[in-house]
Amino acid sequence: MSFEITVQELQAKQNVGTDCVLLDVREQEEVELVQLPNSVHIPMGDIPSRLHELDPDSEIVVYCHHGVRSLQVVHFLHQHDFEHVVSLAGGIDFWAIEIEPEMTRY
């Protein structure tokens, strides 16, 4: 089972209208710099206490700056019976490089 999705795969899903939740697990200061549209923001440290806000049956793409924190959150969610959860490989930074070069990078 793959725990990651590439930025190209996510873009393809969005282009065909696939319904998935974009879960941004970065800190508030990072979100204020740049965020993918229609994202749900729950900082990584708040995930355990806010787990009830997420639907375990939804397809969820978790992202952070480079893909490290998001992968940790994916493993945590899998341990809590979330079966359709993947991490955005390379994070929002790789999205900016590959998909939206005009996007703010930090």
Language-model features, listed with the residues they occupy:
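Short, surface-exposed ligand- or partner-binding patches at beta-edge/loop junctions that are enriched
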Residues: Y63-C64
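Rhodanese-like catalytic fold shared by cysteine-dependent sulfurtransferases
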Residues: M1-V21, E27-E59, V68-Y106
